Each structure stands twice: as C-alpha cells, then as structure tokens.
Amino acid sequence: METIATRLAILPFPEIDPVIFTIGPLAVRWYGLAYVVGILLGWFYARRIVQNAALWRNGTPACNLTQLDDFLLWAAGGIVLGGRIGYILFYDLGSILDDPLRAIQIWNGGMSFHGGLVGTTLAMIIFARRNAIPIWSLFDVVAAVVPIGLFFGRIANFINGELWGRLSSVPWAVVFPTGGPFARHPSQLYEAALEGLVLLAVLAWFVYRRKALKIPGLVTGIFVCGYAASRIFVEFFREPDAQIGYLAGDWLTMGMVLSVPMALIGIWAIARARSAAAAA
C-alpha cells in the first residue's frame, strides 16, 4: 500500500528557470544573485563585528570600517577567481581542455568552495600586509561571516537542480530534472543547513559569548574544522561529480579528500591560537 512518505519521495522537483529576469541583454540568474546577496550580507555582518569594540582584545578591532569596505572587492575577486580555478583543477579539467571557453562560463555554474577558500586566503594575506592588519584577526572576521555565503550558494544550487544527492527513499527525497527518474537526497539543503545556518550559529556563539576574537586564529580554526566536518558528513549523501565519480569504493569522493587536510589545518589553527593565548 502506497504511503504518504512514498508519494512524497517521488514528487518531481519543480523545474525553475535559472534566469530570474532579464533587463535587455542582461540576465539575472539565481546563482549570481546568491553570490551577491551572500557577499553583501556577510559584509554587513562583518561591519557589525568590527564596530563592536567589546569583542576585541583591548577594545581594538583588527581593522577599521574603511579598510573593511576596501577589502570587499578583494574578497569578491578571491571567491570568484579561486572558486572557478579550483573547480577546473579539482573537478573538470578534462572538459575545460576540450572546450577552453567553458572556463569563463561562470553563469553556468561550476565553483569550488575549496578553491574559493584558497583564493580568498591569498587575497586576505596580500590585503593584510598592504594595510598593516593582523592577519589572523582578519581571517577571524571573514571566517565568522563565510557561512552566510555558503547558505545562499547552496540554496541556489538547489533552485538550479544541481549537485543533487544520492538515490534515496526518505520522505523528503526529490526527483531532480537532471538527476534521472529516481528520488534523491536534497543534499544541497543539508549543506545549506550545516555549512550555513548551524556553522553560522556556532561561530556567532563563540564570537559573542566566548569572545573568541580576543584569541586571534581561534574563530578561523573553528570555522575550518566545522566546514570540513560538515562537508565530509554530507558527502555520504551527495552524488559525486559525474566526470570524477568515486575515488575509492563507492564512498570516497573528491570533496572528502579536499576536506581532510582542511580539518587538520583547522585543528592546528585552534592549537596555535590557544598556545599563543596561554603564552601571552
């Protein structure tokens, strides 16, 4: 006998146009809007953190608002360039070599968080040195707000019907337009919840309740560990990229491989921050 859960599990995902609206030749897409909204909300939240002197050691924020505003463009460049280059290198090098023009077609999707993290980290290092900003404190401010962008990015992935999960019969499983006739885990929403909402709340608790910004590098380490743990967990429900597949057995994915060193770096950053604080 068919149950409500079974009927829910075979509901097709409504095919949503990736283009929200057009203005002449300009097409506004969900993917691009997610990046813009995520960056702007993250910038707004970062300004509030920097303005709150009580969160900082000796009441001195890592940077002033003018410097933070200037960094916005650097951050956007690091995210987009690093994310795209990372995706090409980690996930789609063969296809790009066959059709090099695909490398610049960002509007069709294809961004790597790990690549974006590397790009943004390089942007922060250069910007901090140019402006005499304590690098670990700048890392901490950015780390505290990154989950906002992750949340909106994963919601855009869901709307676009991309990066879907593995086959599933859970009541909330979804039949995606490009995922075949079978229901799948909405793994984009799992990531939006864990990497976005949950991680944002955890970091906010450390920032506001534990005053973690007074220990440079601690928030960064917590973010990196939290993201790595969330990503590795969700990878068990997410379908691997078709052009790569599983790296070993039917479980090891590129996302897991890239997240393991992240977790180790996060643990090191936390240990380093605590050691430096104890020695101060």
Swiss-Prot record:
Record-listed a 1,2-diacyl-sn-glycero-3-phospho-(1'-sn-glycerol) binding positions: R154
UniProt-listed InterPro entries: Lgt
Enzyme class: transferase
Main location: membrane
Pathway(s) of this molecule: Protein modification; lipoprotein biosynthesis (diacylglyceryl transfer)
The keyword Ribosomal protein is annotated on this UniProt entry: no
GO molecular function: phosphatidylglycerol-prolipoprotein diacylglyceryl transferase activity
UniProt xrefs under Pfam families: LGT
One cellular component (GO) term of this entry: plasma membrane
Transmembrane segments: 30-50, 71-91, 106-126, 132-152, 188-208, 217-237, 251-271
Alphabetically ordered keywords of this record: Cell inner membrane, Cell membrane, Membrane, Transferase, Transmembrane, Transmembrane helix
GO biological process: lipoprotein biosynthetic process
EC number per UniProt: 2.5.1.145
Subcellular location: Cell inner membrane
Membrane topology: Multi-pass membrane protein
PROSITE patterns for the chain: LGT
Keyword Manganese belongs to the record: no
UniProt family annotation: Belongs to the Lgt family.
HAMAP family listed in its UniProt record: Lgt
Role description: Catalyzes the transfer of the diacylglyceryl group from phosphatidylglycerol to the sulfhydryl group of the N-terminal cysteine of a prolipoprotein, the first step in the formation of mature lipoproteins.
UniProt-listed PANTHER family: PHOSPHATIDYLGLYCEROL--PROLIPOPROTEIN DIACYLGLYCERYL TRANSFERASE (PTHR30589:SF0), PROLIPOPROTEIN DIACYLGLYCERYL TRANSFERASE (PTHR30589)
Protein name listed in UniProt: Phosphatidylglycerol--prolipoprotein diacylglyceryl transferase
Source organism (scientific name): Sinorhizobium medicae (strain WSM419) (Ensifer medicae)
